[in-house]
Amino acid sequence: MLFRSVTYVTGLLKGNLGTSLRTKQPVTKEVAGRFGNTVRLAFVTLLWSSVVGVLFGVWSGTHRGKWQDYTGMTIAVSGISLPSFWIGFLLIMLFAVKLRILPTTSGTSLKSLIMPSITLGVGIAAVIARFTRSSIIEVLKEDYVRTARAKGIKEKVVIWKHVFRNSMISVVTVVGLQFGFLLGGSVVTETVFAYPGLGSLLIESVNYRDYPAIQSLILIFSLQFIVINLIVDILYAVLNPEIKLQ
């Protein structure tokens, strides 16, 4: 058992993930063929969901207790509550079956990324919006914000120059963690849209009991999340001098 474990770890260090029982091809080759698709989907999803989430969060946070805040947070809670597979089926029925303006299954073109990206990004945008709102509210209580307002600086300048910049330091952490989730947590969405990514490859491997592929994919997902967390910690230290000093 010890010898087999050492042999397996040695193979991993050399980039050898074993041979797929289903295709008789090296698992490394299968992963390499789909890894780029998963990264592309994750990047597009994170890009638009971050922008939408931050804007909704700022909108709600700067209007705390008003109808703008209640509207924004109601939308955010709805986005978190809706299951991704239900959103996916709804999009397919509307845009692919009824309106016929988007493909039912996903390829690698930009148009085919729209529905999977929306399905994945709704919940992520909602999480970012709620976190941004909390961060905005906390920064608004700081003394330098009150000082800026007392000097007669325009409210828009105070919000975007002082409040927004400082609140984004903590939001970066959430965005980074969501990117790690997108790289490893898009299994359901990729399956619904038949998207050729690592998530759908994992489902195919499970259905065929392709244990070398399953083991390798779980390992890759874990390493991705660890690396993303490390990068987020480094970025947080760079953006926040207090963390760097500690």
Feature roles, as predicted:
Residues 1-54:
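An internal, D/E-rich "acidic patch" concept
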Residues 3-6, 18-21, 87-88, 103-105, ...:
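Short, hydrophobic secondary-structure boundary micro-motifs
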Residues 4-17, 27, 31, 71-78, ...:
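Hydrophobic alpha-helical segments of integral membrane proteins
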Residues 8-10, 74-103, 119-123:
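Membrane-water interface segments at the C-terminal ends of transmembrane alpha-helices
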Residues 12, 16, 22, 26, ...:
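Residue-level signal for pocket-adjacent positions within structured domains
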Residues 14, 87-88, 137:
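Alpha-helical transmembrane segments and their lipid-water interface positions
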Residues 35-68, 107-246:
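Alpha-helical transmembrane segments of integral membrane proteins
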